[in-house]
């Protein structure tokens, strides 16, 4: 097995563990959200969201890129077997996040009256904002633990923490609301759940920390480590803050120019359905960063090139077909849950999904490679470019085309930055994406999506049973079409199957199912003489 394949195996294993954690925690949280919406009035539910908004905004200034630096340096030092520096990274990272988190929580607590009265014009929510302010500190524990798990590629521990947070949040919020505490109980339950998850995360990180050797002659270099981490991570933190302001601007121009609330409702529904794609995209993005951080281009240039091309091709083989499948099934999927209440939502979902097709040209890999190799200042420049394009583009597009204009703007605003990133990677690392593979993946997935869509259009869809039938047949038609087209067009070849077999070994019991699938593809290849 090549080192690139071995790294892909480790990353795939981590991604799989993150996937089941994301799915389970999202399902639990969704159930809780639905129940909470039934227990609280629409007004109280709105106050719950408003009270959490201000601390969430202030929390953006807590990180300073430290968590990203924890991932980067723990992965790098782990590959170098430099345990002493990993210890310093963990201790320095937690110390910084806790101190700054506490300071910002106190600041939010102090400003709660001003925020409630002047900013939100709702003096009655002062107490809610005061309690919600502690999310800045408790959230610091969770996010720092997540960074430590990611850098050490222990994503099963992260999934345990996520599920505990979702379960406690759902149970505590519902329980306290049922006790008659209303919005106050919902806020209390949320904070207690995040605190519980944070404590669990810290304890799990401590178990990893205790396993490290502890030579008595080596001291923790906390101040030097913090300086190094801030120097690396601060540009990324600035970029995150700028991107956050851009997201707020999107919401502002939508509310300002789109006067039809039903269109905004349909947009909200379609946004929730995009989560189906992010279930697959997020684990890929998360695990690529530590993978690139472990490589030194000066010493392992050829390996880095292979890993980059691997990452683009195999992330595209996962995300792009899922994206086209979601597009093809947008109508039955949304109408099963909501009927005809949100008629524009399927179209909005199709348009929002387009952004994930850029996975085929490296949208999930390029930034991770640049950050993993330490070029965070350049990544900040890319973010500034995106923001500079995003403000005027979204304003013009929403003014002219409403929600559709917003979706087009948000889906394409990152393209210039992506092209510059690919140019930077080509110039500095001498590697480009495999354009032939990317085009084949897009073609095979797109054609499968079209076949699925037109096949379903021939079926009746007037009843709930018929919609379920469409959904089931749609998945079957897409899966068969994609496999056959991929074989005929050589989108997947025998080398890919060998690599997939090796990577699948990281999936434990599921590897047997994947091997059965790979064996089936091999049989079909022989039939088609590919």
Segments (PLM) and residue ranges:
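Signature of the first transmembrane helix
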Residues: 10-72, 96, 101-109, 135-136, ...
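N-terminal membrane topogenesis motif
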Residues: 1-29, 83-92, 217-239, 345, ...
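Transmembrane helical elements of multi-pass membrane transporters/channels
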Residues: 13-30, 165, 189-197, 201, ...
């Amino acid at each position: 097995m090549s080192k690139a394949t071995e790294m892909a195996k480790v990353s795939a294993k981590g991604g799989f563990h993150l996937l089941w954690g994301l799915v389970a925690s999202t399902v639990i949280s969704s159930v809780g959200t639905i129940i909470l919406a039934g227990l609280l009035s629409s007004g109280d539910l709105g106050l719950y969201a408003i009270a959490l908004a201000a601390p969430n905004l202030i929390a953006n200034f807590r990180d300073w890129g430290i968590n990203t630096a924890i991932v980067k340096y723990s992965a790098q030092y782990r590959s170098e077997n430099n345990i002493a520096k990993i210890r310093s990274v963990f201790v320095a990272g937690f110390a910084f996040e806790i101190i700054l988190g506490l300071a910002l929580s106190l600041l939010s607590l102090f400003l709660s009256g001003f925020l409630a009265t002047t900013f939100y014009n709702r003096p009655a929510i002062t107490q809610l904002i005061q309690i919600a302010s502690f999310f800045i500190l408790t959230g610091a524990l969770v996010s720092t633990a997540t960074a430590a798990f990611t850098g050490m590629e222990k994503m099963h521990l992260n999934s345990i923490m996520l599920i505990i947070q979702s379960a406690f949040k759902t149970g505590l919020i519902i329980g306290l609301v049922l006790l008659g505490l209303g919005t106050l109980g919902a806020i209390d339950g949320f904070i207690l759940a995040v605190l519980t998850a944070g404590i669990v995360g810290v304890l799990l990180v401590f178990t990893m920390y205790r396993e490290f050797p502890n030579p008595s002659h080596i001291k923790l270099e906390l101040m030097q480590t913090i300086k190094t981490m801030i120097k690396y991570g601060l540009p990324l933190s600035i970029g995150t803050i700028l991107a956050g302001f851009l997201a707020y601007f999107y919401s502002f121009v939508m509310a300002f120019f789109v006067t039809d609330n039903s269109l905004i409702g349909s947009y909200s529904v379609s946004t929730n359905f995009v989560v189906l794609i992010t279930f697959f995209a997020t684990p890929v993005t998360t695990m690529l960063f530590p993978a690139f951080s472990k490589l030194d281009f000066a010493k392992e240039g050829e390996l880095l090139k292979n890993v980059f091309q691997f990452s683009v091709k195999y992330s595209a083989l996962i995300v792009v077909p899922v994206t086209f499948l979601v597009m093809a099934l947008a109508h039955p999927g949304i109408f099963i849950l909501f009927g005809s209440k949100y008629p524009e939502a399927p179209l909005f979902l199709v348009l929002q999904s387009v952004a994930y097709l850029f996975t085929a040209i490296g949208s999930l890999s390029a930034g991770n490679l640049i950050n993993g190799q330490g070029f965070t200042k350049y990544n900040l420049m890319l973010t500034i470019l995106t923001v500079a394009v995003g403000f005027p583009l979204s304003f013009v597009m929403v003014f002219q085309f409403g929600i559709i204009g917003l979706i087009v703007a948000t889906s394409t605003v990152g393209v210039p930055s992506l092209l510059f990133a690919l140019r930077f990677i080509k110039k500095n690392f001498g590697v480009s994406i495999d354009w032939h593979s990317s085009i084949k993946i897009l073609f095979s997935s797109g054609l499968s999506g079209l076949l699925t869509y037109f096949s379903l259009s021939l079926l009746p869809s007037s009843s709930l049973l018929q919609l379920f039938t469409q959904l089931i047949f749609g998945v079957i038609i897409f899966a068969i079409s994609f496999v056959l087209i991929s074989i005929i067009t050589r989108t997947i070849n025998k080398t890919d199957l060998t690599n997939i077999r090796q990577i699948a070994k990281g999936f434990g019991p599921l590897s047997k199912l994947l091997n059965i699938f790979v064996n089936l593809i091999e049989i079909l290849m022989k039939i088609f003489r590919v």
